[in-house]
Design a protein with these regions (language model features):
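Intrinsically disordered, low-complexity, charged/polar segments
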Residues: 61-71, 76-131
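Short beta-strand-centered aromatic/proline hotspots
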Residues: 21-34, 55-57, 63-79
Length: 131
């Protein structure tokens, strides 16, 4: 596919399954605070108290991802001439989503990628040499 090379930025359209997958890893600051306060008491002469969320643990926090949402994504790998690609989707939060084997669809169907604007694929020629 013309102009499709690793490093290009395109748009990815979430479908319900991928949105749920991205959302499953996310939490909120309120949820973290509640879990940090929740502990399982220590057993006398046995196991120590267990904190539901250890201080310093990494969390993925951000706005909700839903089916139909469109996010910018960087092309990581291109699989042949059809436009099927692996993408790193930049979410609205502290994390990103790795979308694999995503097909191009000019109609912008859910679960596909498309160019950000008409003609984008022709605006950059990585083979052009400037002296």
């Amino acid at each position: 596919m013309e102009g499709l090379v690793p490093g290009r930025i395109v748009y990815f359209v979430f479908d319900a399954g991928r949105a749920a997958e991205a959302q499953r890893r996310r939490t909120s600051s309120q949820s973290i605070l509640a879990r940090m306060k929740a502990t399982t008491p220590a057993v006398e002469g046995g196991a120590p108290a267990i904190v539901a969320w250890p201080a310093g643990a990494q969390a993925h926090i951000g706005n909700e991802v839903k089916a139909g949402d469109i996010y910018p994504a960087m092309v990581l790998r291109v699989w042949g001439e059809s436009g099927c690609s692996n993408l790193k989707v930049m979410l609205d939060g502290s994390d990103e989503y790795w979308a694999t084997s995503i097909n191009f669809d000019a109609a912008k169907a859910q679960g596909s990628w498309h160019w950000m604007f008409d003609g984008q694929q022709k605006r950059y020629d990585p083979t052009a040499v400037k002296v």
